[in-house]
Amino acid sequence: MRYDGRKNNELRPVTMDLDFITHPEGSVLITVGGTKVICNASVEDRVPPFLRGEGKGWITAEYSMLPRATNQRTIRESSKGKISGRTMEIQRLIGRALRAVVDLEKLGERTIWIDCDVIQADGGTRTASITGAFTAMALAVGRLVEKGALKEMPITDFLAATSVGIDKEKGLILDLNYQEDSAAEVDMNVVMTGEGRFVELQGTGEEATFSRSELDGLLELAEKGIAELLEKQKEVLGDVALSIQQ
């Protein structure tokens, strides 16, 4: 039995509250157990200089964490005057993941800014951010299609992410909370599409190694969890989800 009473192959409770913030074109508060992330999608009718005149759009992301999202207060990165390597890595991961499931030419010369702000952290903030960011982006793009700004849906597939790991006593586990993540011998983040294709794998051993069979087991576990997250997205997105599936 895990710390919170879950089975090894069980996700934490997941909710997605749409339009949590009223101003963005798409907004979602995603809650995964004790982790809560506000994901906003904002649309600009312009692209970065390197894409001007190319007839393509762009999707980029920013990620941050409130000072008291964690057990002890952390200093805001804006106060430090620089972004940490971890933050930069997560921002790039979110942007890459979202671009993998969007036809940027169909998006046209516009930019979708994704802002993921962690208001409470209990493990899996980057994977929750990706899952919530996709949902917010789908909301925003669906509204562009609805009002005629886009002729067709540029999102080609669904996208979600989760974490898996190996605990010395419990074995393979899905969706690690902070306590489990801190103690895990192996920790892996997995990003997948609705068709079951991989976008990104980030896996490391902490003073430990893992076998090919364990890797296969981790991926199977992640696939199960992501399938459940995808169903949750489809449930909350309603008609927008149907337009992506067409």
UniProtKB/Swiss-Prot annotation:
Under Enzyme Commission nomenclature, its number is: 2.7.7.56
Task: Tell me which Pfam families the record gives.
Answer: RNase_PH, RNase_PH_C
Q: Does the keyword tRNA-binding apply?
A: yes
List the catalytic activities from the record.
Answer: tRNA(n+1) + phosphate = tRNA(n) + a ribonucleoside 5'-diphosphate
> Record-annotated residues binding phosphate?
86, 124-126
Is Transferase one of the keywords? Answer: yes
Q: Which GO terms describe its biological process?
A: rRNA catabolic process; rRNA processing; tRNA processing
By its UniProt entry, which InterPro entries does this protein fall under? ExoRNase_PH_dom1 (IPR001247), ExoRNase_PH_dom2 (IPR015847), ExoRNase_PH_dom2_sf (IPR036345), PNPase/RNase_PH_dom_sf (IPR027408), Ribosomal_Su5_D2-typ_SF (IPR020568), RNase_PH (IPR050080), RNase_PH_bac-type (IPR002381), RNase_PH_CS (IPR018336)
Which GO molecular function entries does the Swiss-Prot or TrEMBL record give? 3'-5'-RNA exonuclease activity; tRNA binding; tRNA nucleotidyltransferase activity
SUPFAM superfamilies per the UniProt record, alphabetical: Ribonuclease PH domain 2-like, Ribosomal protein S5 domain 2-like
Top-level taxon in the UniProt lineage: Bacteria
Q: What class of enzyme is it?
A: transferase
Functional summary from the UniProt entry: Phosphorolytic 3'-5' exoribonuclease that plays an important role in tRNA 3'-end maturation. Removes nucleotide residues following the 3'-CCA terminus of tRNAs; can also add nucleotides to the ends of RNA molecules by using nucleoside diphosphates as substrates, but this may not be physiologically important. Probably plays a role in initiation of 16S rRNA degradation (leading to ribosome degradation) during starvation.
User: Which family is it part of?
Assistant: Belongs to the RNase PH family.
Quaternary structure (record): Homohexameric ring arranged as a trimer of dimers.
The entry's protein name is Ribonuclease PH
The source organism is Bacillus licheniformis (strain ATCC 14580 / DSM 13 / JCM 2505 / CCUG 7422 / NBRC 12200 / NCIMB 9375 / NCTC 10341 / NRRL NRS-1264 / Gibson 46)
Q: From which lineage does this chain's organism come?
A: Bacteria, Bacillati, Bacillota, Bacilli, Bacillales
